[in-house]
Swiss-Prot record:
Oligomer status and interactors: Homotetramer. Forms heterodimers with either ThiH or ThiS.
GO CC aspect terms: cytoplasm
Cystine connections: none
Enzyme class: transferase
Active site, renumbered: K110 (schiff-base intermediate with dxp)
One annotated GO biological process: thiamine diphosphate biosynthetic process
Protein's UniProt name: Thiazole synthase
InterPro entries: Aldolase_TIM (IPR013785), Thiazole_synthase_ThiG (IPR033983), ThiG (IPR008867)
Family listed: Belongs to the ThiG family.
Enzyme Commission numbers on file: 2.8.1.10
Domain of life the protein comes from: Bacteria
Amino acid sequence: MEDAVTMDTAFEDKPLVVAGRTFTSRLIIGTGKYKTYAQNAQALEASGAEMITVAIRRVNLSNPDEPRLVDFISPDDYTFLPNTAGCFTGEDAVRTLRLAREAGGWNLVKLEVLSDPKHLYPDMAETLRAAELLIKDGFDVMVYCSDDPVYARKLEEIGCCAIMPLGAPIGSGLGIQNPVNIRLIIEQTKVPVIVDAGVGTASDATVAMELGCDGVLMNTAIAEAKDPIRMARAMRHAVIAGRESYLAGRMPKKRYADPSSPLSGLI
């Protein structure tokens, strides 16, 4: 029994902590592109996620005459993460999040300032400027950014509570396109690093976690799957598998074969 307890302890992992908030799930999902809020709620439950992004400019939170997200997903049960999807200037992003705080009292927010509607890459100069304003205003800022280690360091230095580099363009489903840069960001960063955007299927989520990311955020990969609920469940297992694999440490790659059964002592 003592050996079993020791083994269980060895397999334990530290929880994800963002701005003093603790999460057991390392998967974050969104609220866009689902057919209904009911489907979104089912996917959320299947995913095991505890945090869900909310596009303040697009999601109905308050109008009782139309379907409301809060009628299906309660902020008492999940951490709502207001984001600035659709904002193309720092001023617009700051204004949106200030309105979100007035409406729901949210201080933990996700900042994204986009550049071009075609590729939705972040405008890093505007992102940095907006992040500084929000942090001075008392927000805990999780920030969507490029996979540039230099900008990632600057965002951490000004006080962002999580760095969220893209794996590929938003909604592209291309998977992790620049694992080298993602790894560089992980190695230099003390706050959580969460891949945001580009995940297309479960194996992409596993790759992100095997690189050493603290979490993965996704929306389209689940919402546009043929079976969103099943894909949400797949993503749940993929994130866990990737994290376990990272903690276990993979075997070294070798140029030549190495037999599984020792050759010594053969009859």
